[in-house]
Amino acid sequence: MIHLILDSTSGVGADFLALHPNVHCISLTIEMGENYVPESEATIKAVIDYSEATKKSVPTSQPSTGDFLKLFSDIPAEDPIIVLCICSTISGTYNGALLAARQSGRKNITVINTRTTAIGMIHLLEDGLDMIQKGLSYEEIAKALEEASMRTGLTVALDTIDYLKRGGRIGKAAGLIGSILKIKPVIYLNENNEVDALGKVRTTKKANALMIDYLKKQEPLKRLGIVHIENEAGAKVLYDKAKEMYPDMDITLTTATPVLTAYLGPGLTGFIFERAK
């Protein structure tokens, strides 16, 4: 049996895991004061409340090497494993998984930097499960998912730059710091998989237009998802626009996870996509 492992920033649900014994989730950890909470047990509200009360970053930590090794050991040695990790420039999870795979001594583990997160990782998971169902080999599936990860992308509009700034993940979007008040920073992952500034505008309408223009430049698309953090109304606006553009595409609207909230803050809306071949 081929096994697929995702990290908790994917947002994969417990019900889904219960239905798929070959799919596993490994949790990142959120630090709020003296409390270390697995992301799977944390809430978005708790992260926001802590950050707003302290005006500090909410530290997160990747799964430990031991966590990965324990999960690997729970899977039969003869069963191949594909690990799908959050974008490596946002979290060290990918590098940690690579180290654990080497230490395990197993030759049948492939670790993939998905270059995405949230619904983007779920899209890759769904593709992996579909290929397993069709009877493709471990090597074929790993290669296909590696290639698909190179076609992923995202762009999001932030309600605040504070969370990126506090957490030190601002990357090439540093130029947004100190900008005029009440702007809508729009970021994306550039060709080097780094957080970069797409632009800064004053209104949500202009932020949406900027993201839509960027999305059009990525066409043709294979998959598209809408993501938000405590902004379902804003996400619904993007969803409606996306359905107008791609009426035949199955577009998913979903919330991000507590770790992504610690990185990016509340109010976010945006697109996560995979380009067609």
Where are these regions (language model features)?
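Class I S-adenosyl-L-methionine
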Residues: 35-103
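Mixed-charge interfacial surface used for oligomerization/domain docking
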Residues: 3, 8-34, 73, 80, ...
